[in-house]
């Protein structure tokens, strides 16, 4: 995976989408993964249809999709959708570890800076 796009030691892959769902960049497990991009866009479109009476004054800032071995962190900034697939554990010197990290993705082409905090248990 491109070292400039690696935002966490436990990162498995990433997608960068335009707000209309078109794939701009990808890497790792998500390299050219149009299917995942379509599923994520469907999920984001679903969040737009939440009844205001059910959740007044709420806006979704980040979505996390949690699986046993990994999770996806999805956020939007400057009309771009950033998706990162992260392993719940990673190995260092052959030992499986848990970690707490703060991550930042810099999109040099657009001057965007996406940050998130991750705690792994």
Curated annotation (Swiss-Prot):
GO cellular component, one term: Ragulator complex
Region feature (Disordered): 91-121
GO terms classed as biological process: cellular response to amino acid stimulus; positive regulation of TOR signaling; protein localization to lysosome; regulation of cell size
Swiss-Prot/TrEMBL keywords: Lysosome
Biased composition (Polar residues): 112-121
Subcellular location: Lysosome
Domain of life: Eukaryota
Chief location: other
UniProt xrefs under InterPro entries: LAMTOR4 (IPR034601)
One Gene Ontology term of the molecular function aspect: guanyl-nucleotide exchange factor activity
Membership in a protein family: Belongs to the LAMTOR4 family.
Record function comment: Regulator of the TOR pathway, a signaling cascade that promotes cell growth in response to growth factors, energy levels, and amino acids. As part of the Ragulator complex, may activate the TOR signaling cascade in response to amino acids.
Complex formation: Part of the Ragulator complex.
Protein name: Ragulator complex protein LAMTOR4 homolog
